[in-house]
Amino acid sequence: MGENMIKSEDLVFKYVNAEEQTEKVAINHVSMEVKKGEFLVILGHNGSGKSTMAKHMNALLLPSGGKMYVDGLDTSDIENLWEVRRRAGMVFQNPDNQLVATIVEEDVAFGPENLGVDPKEIRERVDDSLKAVGMYEYRKHAPHLLSGGQKQRIAIAGILAMRPKCIVLDEPTAMLDPSGRNEVMKTIKEVNKKFGITIILITHYMDEAAQADRIIVMDKGEKVMEGVPREIFSQVEKIKSIGLDVPQVTELAYELQKEGVDISTEILNIDEMVNALCQLK
């Protein structure tokens, strides 16, 4: 992983509260970098600024101050908007709001058609994208008959068909059941590893965040923590003071350590917990 896919410099975003006629700062001088090919999670509770940050990454929102660069392109330059949105695709929380056609393959073709891609290549892109997310056999189905997890995979296929360099996912599993969440997370990781596409996942699920290469934690519009998952989640008290939880096994290790058990809090999954417990005398 070399150069940056996403870079913000001292980013500020303010919006006006129409009722109170006051300005609210949603992002307060945040600088961050996301390397090409990286899988980054941005964590934070409601109102932390994480979704506002995500919307800057494909120029749905533009900075009130500071800069946001997507693959080296300044999002504040109006001439860059089309190219920024082509390079950074976005998947939202509600799958039903993202599907536009009555047949799955037509929905996936919608983006490339709007880019003016040749029909023969569109056919190839649609098939390749549906295979990549494990939904090729549903290509002739009606999207509204699919499960929530399947719909989100179709939404991801629609972004893949546009050949982006980066996909920003704003709480894509928030409305899904556990099996749907697992389907979507598996797809996200495969897209990242197989195609080298940069992934930025906005979430408040700790087990999802634990699977990332790196985590940024936001609180009250500011970046308050940054590091690899083990580094972040081992700071249990700090995470809790921000109003977040840690993965269940990390919480268990923390409670055991408090009771005097010689165990690390840098435990992220059940296998690691089993190994750590087996080594205790």
From Swiss-Prot:
Key words, A-Z:
ATP-binding, Cell membrane, Membrane, Nucleotide-binding, Translocase, Transport
* Any one GO CC term of the record: ATP-binding cassette (ABC) transporter complex
Which residues does ATP bind?
Answer: 44-51
Q: Which Pfam families match?
A: ABC_tran
Localization terms from the record = Cell membrane
Task: Give the membrane topology, semicolon-separated if more than one.
Answer: Peripheral membrane protein
Q: What are the ABC transporter domain coordinates in residue numbering?
A: 6-245
Lyase recorded as keyword: no
Q: Which one of the record's GO molecular function terms can you name?
A: ATP binding
Query: PROSITE patterns recorded for this chain?
Result: ABC_TRANSPORTER_1, ABC_TRANSPORTER_2, CBIO
Q: Tell me yes or no: is Transport among this UniProt entry's keywords.
A: yes
Q: What is its EC number?
A: 7.-.-.-
What do we know about how this protein assembles, alone or with others?
Forms a stable energy-coupling factor (ECF) transporter complex composed of 2 membrane-embedded substrate-binding proteins (S component), 2 ATP-binding proteins (A component) and 2 transmembrane proteins (T component).
UniProt-listed PANTHER family:
ENERGY-COUPLING FACTOR TRANSPORTER ATP-BINDING PROTEIN ECFA1, HEAVY METAL TRANSPORTER
The task this protein performs is described as: ATP-binding (A) component of a common energy-coupling factor (ECF) ABC-transporter complex. Unlike classic ABC transporters this ECF transporter provides the energy necessary to transport a number of different substrates.
Q: Which NCBIfam families match?
A: ECF_ATPase_1, PRK13648.1
Q: Which family does it belong to?
A: Belongs to the ABC transporter superfamily. Energy-coupling factor EcfA family.
The protein in question is named: Energy-coupling factor transporter ATP-binding protein EcfA1
Q: Which organism is it from?
A: Clostridium perfringens (strain 13 / Type A)
